[in-house]
Amino acid sequence: MFEITGINVSGALKAVVMATGFENPLSSVNEIETKLSALLGSETTGEILFDLLCANGPEWNRFVTLEMKYGRIMLDTAKIIDEQDVPTHILSKLTFTLRNHPEYLEASVLSPDDVRQVLSMDF
């Protein structure tokens, strides 16, 4: 499952999509495209940032960007993004969302220690 935590974030970044459990949201790409097209319009072109923390854990592949062209997510454009390259205001919003939705953490692959670390993050 997934939650869209931001739209028209900044510049080319059109949306942020967060995994809300152990399933990778990229397995629901058609549903994501439908929801993003409803929010942004079917002619939207830009970048989508995926936070896969709940699906992948606090690993090197937590953040991935994909291009969206005219409402379609282009899977062949996937790029892994280092956490240091994610703007602080986005990290802060993601942490805020996780703190307010403990069910996301409970449905994730995160260990109890990982959950404590996520909840103690401060941006």
Curated annotation (Swiss-Prot):
Disulfide bonds: none
Induction: Not repressed by IscR. rnlA-rnlB forms an operon, the downstream rnlB also has its own promoter.
Keywords: Toxin-antitoxin system
InterPro entries for the chain: RnlB/LsoB_antitoxin
Free-text disruption phenotype from the record: Essential, it cannot be deleted unless rnlA is also disrupted.
Gene Ontology CC: toxin-antitoxin complex
Record's keyword annotation contains Disulfide bond: no
Entry comment on modification after translation: Probably degraded by CplXP and Lon proteases.
Any one GO BP annotation for this protein: single-species biofilm formation
UniProt keyword Membrane, yes or no: no
Function: Antitoxin component of a type II toxin-antitoxin (TA) system. A labile antitoxin (half-life of 2.1 minutes) that inhibits the endonuclease activity of cognate toxin RnlA but not that of non-cognate toxin LsoA.
Subunit structure, interactors included: Can form a complex with cognate toxin RnlA.
Descriptive protein name: Antitoxin RnlB
